Amino acid sequence: MPKETGRKSIAQNKRARHDYDILDTYEAGLVLRGTEVKALRAGRASLVDGFAQVSDGEIWLHNVHIPEYTEGTWTNHAPRRKRKMLLHRAEIEKLIGQTQEGGLTLVPLALYWKDGRAKIEIALARGRKSYDKRHALAERDAAREISREMGRRVKGRYR
């Protein structure tokens, strides 16, 4: 069987880009059990309530839901267990410093396969207030309307 290459998406956390200002992103590996890998191969995971936390100089992923493998037996994993993330020591130290600074958190953005290994994209983020969310939504709508109008003008269809 040929080795997998490229990036194949498993799950996205679309809500994170709405709820947080993304400052920086990192790619990390995950320490998984066999049944978790099989469940991910089936494309089943949810990042919605997930977050990462620093504990004893390591970064742990919490609340990411990987459902039990349907064909698994008593060896199945707990769906919301905490999972260790694999990063370089320098990246871990940098993240520890930035998250202890205050107001910053680590949120998962995407879970995907890269060259046959499960990877997670995490973001260093700052939470948005509700008025910031409304402002960002209004800006996005205005930009979309401008782009539509420019498209109409280029095509020669004026209102």
From Swiss-Prot:
Compartments (UniProt record): Cytoplasm
HAMAP family in alphabetical order: SmpB
Domain of life: Bacteria
Pfam families registered for this protein in UniProt: SmpB
Function: Required for rescue of stalled ribosomes mediated by trans-translation. Binds to transfer-messenger RNA (tmRNA), required for stable association of tmRNA with ribosomes. tmRNA and SmpB together mimic tRNA shape, replacing the anticodon stem-loop with SmpB. tmRNA is encoded by the ssrA gene; the 2 termini fold to resemble tRNA(Ala) and it encodes a 'tag peptide', a short internal open reading frame. During trans-translation Ala-aminoacylated tmRNA acts like a tRNA, entering the A-site of stalled ribosomes, displacing the stalled mRNA.
BP term (GO), one: trans-translation
Classification of source organism: Bacteria, Bacillati, Actinomycetota, Actinomycetes, Frankiales
Source organism (scientific name): Frankia alni (strain DSM 45986 / CECT 9034 / ACN14a)
Keyword Acyltransferase among UniProt keywords: no
Family: Belongs to the SmpB family.
Name of the protein in its database record: SsrA-binding protein
One GO term describing the cellular component: cytosol
Assigned keywords, A-Z: Cytoplasm, RNA-binding
GO molecular function, one term: RNA binding
